[in-house]
Design a protein with these regions (language model features):
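Hydrophobic face of amphipathic alpha-helices that form TPR/SEL1-like repeat modules
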Residues: 3-12, 26, 41-48, 77-83
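Short helix-capping/linker turns of helical repeat alpha-solenoids
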Residues: 1-6, 10-14, 19, 32-36, ...
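Terminal, low-structured helical/coil segments at or just beyond the last alpha-helical repeat
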Residues: 75-100
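A short, solvent-exposed beta-edge/loop patch
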Residues: 64-68
Length: 100
């Protein structure tokens, strides 16, 4: 099974008991290995505060990394622009540092 789909099952509790810890662990590996789909999911989780504390700079980081892997992804570009508009100046500075 696709590791991102497997992780999402645990994060949402779809067909299995919700287990954020397991879902995040399943998602982190592919994200760290450069899987853009996993990176987008990580960004979405941090942006929404689902299974993680809401952290816009970290969400921005994951979306920015995903966009580097898939530069034509307009949805990710839109997510980045939306996050940028929601962040304070200190959060933006942190987001830039985290994304380098």
């Amino acid at each position: 099974m696709d590791p991102v789909a497997e992780a999402k099952k645990y994060i949402t509790g779809n067909g299995v008991r919700q287990d954020c810890t397991r879902g995040l662990r399943l998602l982190k590996g592919p994200s760290d290995e450069g899987n853009p789909k996993a990176m987008i999911e990580m960004g979405a989780l941090y942006s929404a505060g689902l299974c993680t504390p809401r952290d816009l700079p970290t969400a921005y980081r994951w979306f920015a990394l995903a966009l580097r892997k898939d530069p034509n992804n307009q949805s990710v570009q839109a997510d980045l622009e939306k996050l940028w508009g929601e962040m304070t100046q200190p959060e933006r500075q942190l987001a830039i540092r985290l994304s380098q």
